[in-house]
């Protein structure tokens, strides 16, 4: 799956996005089994998810990851070499600038880049590189961020296709974002205020695109404007394809394909830029002091890169395929179920994926419902799902599966899909009322309240209208069945998207319930019908231009 598609799914609730009580996500706390009582070594984490799991000791149920390197479910499992390096680093003290210099030199030797740096995650690396391009390593400028008054570099150019939720890291520096869509617009946008160009390494950054890295580099290099490529979810290429293709700096997530520390990022590229980026990073005071990276993560990330150069990548791929083969053979015995394996060749999210397909009318369950069943009940399994035109599917991503997971996953999917189910009702329950009109909603967030408005048009069971928040008005759609109302709106801004899913109950002129906002969790709402009517007014159309202003 392309990272762009993955980003679109971030606003959805984890797994399949259904509306379920949060209490169902947690295991019962085991008061007789604490971290200190057991000793950390007393807990086991394996593909079998035994009862003696460290998460269960605090009432949290672990997950088998067949979804990918999503941070919200843990990203990746660190390599054994990484854990050993982090453990060793924790036992002694070191001067951090000296450590950064040593790591920078070693990363250069390993990757062929001019220099290397470890940040507290990929986004932090993006933030520090942006600061470096704005300040040029001048601490007088650094301590004034995000107030860029008087700075000569204050703008970052981003192709429209590369705008995404992660470019908050760039915006945090206080720069002005300039969007472009064509090479001509890019050429026109570059000026003495341009600090850098940011490109996200998905399909729009490939050679056949108008704003590919190669094309951007041709335009940017005569102006000596640095290019930053965000390759967060990619496999590490040595020599690096992005640096060879014209990028000045490339950033990776440490906790994705490279299987380094979850809270680390890998930054490779021009030494002068990376030295300024390190200056902008913790432990140095300024806008990056809050992005602390410890000696443990720094050496753990270096160990992950060293391990990457020695790993048996073809052997890992073969193992992943064997796991998918086991699952496919098990579920293919169910009548109406077909399977296929997708082996991606692109650099991002590169691991085999098993697609399991069936007709909704035959098994009377959708892929999203299967994903919800697997994701919310023990043993929990995170998978992808989609339904279109009566066909539905689930997909199993192998990159972070662990030995033994394949057997549990095969049995779980088989048990769910092989159940006999009655056909789904095709008719919706009749609505209990007509709720067309304006509704004034009080939204209760975790620590504040907000006034919203819902303008509803009802056509039988179907609803459309507008949702007015504090800053924007967006389209809204949904249903009413009996007195149960479900609505959805999406607040879209360049680089951002927030999904509001309202689930409420109608009682007279009041709708109350919960709002599900995906990664932003939940809120409560109470909406009351606004029966106020505007006074009637006859409109006089002028016969010409105004005679006074």
Question: Which residues does each PLM region occupy?
Answer:
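N-terminal secretory signal peptides
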Residues: 1-2
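N-terminal export signals
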Residues: 5-28
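Conserved PLP-enzyme active-site core in the AAT-like
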Residues: 9-10, 14, 31-77, 104-115, ...
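Conserved C-terminal alpha-helix-loop-beta "cap" of PLP-dependent enzymes
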Residues: 54, 332-418
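Generic N-terminal amphipathic, Lys/Arg-enriched alpha-helix
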Residues: 62-72, 83-89, 351-353
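Metallocofactor- and cofactor-centric catalytic cores in central/energy metabolism, strongly enriched
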Residues: 72, 76-77, 83-84, 91-94, ...
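Flexible, glycine/charged-enriched surface loops at secondary-structure junctions
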Residues: 96-101, 115-116, 288-292, 311-320, ...
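Central antiparallel beta-sheet cores of small beta-barrel/beta-sandwich binding domains
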Residues: 430-525, 533, 537-549
């Amino acid at each position: 799956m392309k990272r762009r598609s993955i980003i679109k799914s971030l606003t959805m609730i984890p797994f399949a996005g259904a509306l379920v009580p949060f209490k169902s996500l947690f295991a019962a706390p085991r008061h007789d089994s604490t971290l200190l009582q057991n000793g950390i070594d007393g807990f086991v984490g394996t593909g079998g998810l035994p009862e003696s799991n460290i998460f269960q000791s605090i009432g949290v149920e672990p997950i088998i990851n067949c979804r990918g390197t999503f941070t919200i479910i843990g990203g990746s499992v660190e390599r054994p070499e990484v854990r050993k390096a982090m453990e060793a680093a924790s036992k002694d003290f070191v001067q951090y600038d000296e450590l950064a210099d040593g790591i920078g030199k070693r990363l250069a030797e390993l990757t062929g880049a001019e220099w290397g740096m470890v940040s507290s995650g990929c986004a932090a690396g993006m933030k520090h590189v942006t600061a470096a391009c704005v300040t040029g390593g001048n601490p007088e400028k650094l301590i004034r961020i995000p107030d860029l008054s008087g700075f000569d570099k204050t703008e970052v150019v981003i192709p429209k296709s590369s705008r995404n939720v992660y470019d908050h890291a760039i915006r945090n520096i206080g720069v002005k974002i300039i969007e472009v869509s064509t090479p001509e617009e890019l050429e026109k946008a570059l000026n003495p205020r341009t600090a850098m160009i940011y490109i996200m390494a998905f399909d729009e950054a490939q050679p056949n695109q108008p704003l590919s890295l190669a094309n951007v580099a041709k335009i940017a290099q005569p102006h000596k404007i640095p290019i930053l490529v965000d390759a967060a979810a990619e496999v590490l290429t040595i020599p690096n394809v992005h640096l060879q293709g014209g990028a000045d700096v490339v950033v990776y997530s440490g906790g994705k394909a490279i299987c380094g520390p979850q809270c680390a990022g890998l930054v490779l590229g021009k030494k002068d830029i990376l030295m300024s980026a390190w200056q902008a990073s913790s432990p140095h005071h300024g806008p990056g002091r809050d992005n602390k990276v410890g000696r443990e993560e720094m050496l753990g990330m270096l160990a992950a890169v060293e391990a990457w150069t020695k790993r048996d990548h073809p052997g890992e791929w073969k193992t992943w395929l064997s796991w998918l083969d086991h699952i496919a053979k098990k579920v293919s015995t169910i009548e109406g179920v077909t399977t296929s394996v997708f082996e991606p060749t692109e650099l991002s999210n590169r691991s085999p994926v098993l697609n399991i397909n069936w007709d909704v009318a035959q098994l009377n369950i959708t892929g999203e419902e299967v994903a919800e069943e697997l994701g919310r009940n023990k043993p929990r399994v995170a998978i992808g799902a989609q339904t279109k035109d009566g066909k539905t599917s689930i997909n199993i991503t192998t990159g972070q599966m662990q030995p033994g997971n394949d057997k549990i996953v095969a049995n779980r999917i088989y048990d769910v899909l092989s159940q006999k189910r009655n056909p789904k009702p095709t008719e919706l329950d009749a609505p209990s009322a007509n709720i067309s009109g304006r509704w004034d909603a009080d939204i209760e967030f975790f620590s504040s309240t907000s006034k919203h408005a819902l303008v509803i048009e009802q056509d039988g069971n179907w609803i459309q209208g507008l949702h007015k928040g504090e800053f924007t008005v967006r389209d809204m759609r949904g249903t009413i069945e009996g007195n149960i109302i479900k609505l959805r709106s999406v607040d879209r801004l360049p680089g951002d998207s927030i999904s509001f899913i309202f689930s409420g109950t109608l009682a007279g002129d009041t709708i109350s319930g919960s709002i599900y906002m995906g990664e932003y969790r939940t809120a409560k709402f109470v909406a009351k019908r606004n029966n106020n009517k505007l006074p009637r007014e006859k409109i006089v159309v002028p016969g010409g231009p105004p005679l006074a202003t």
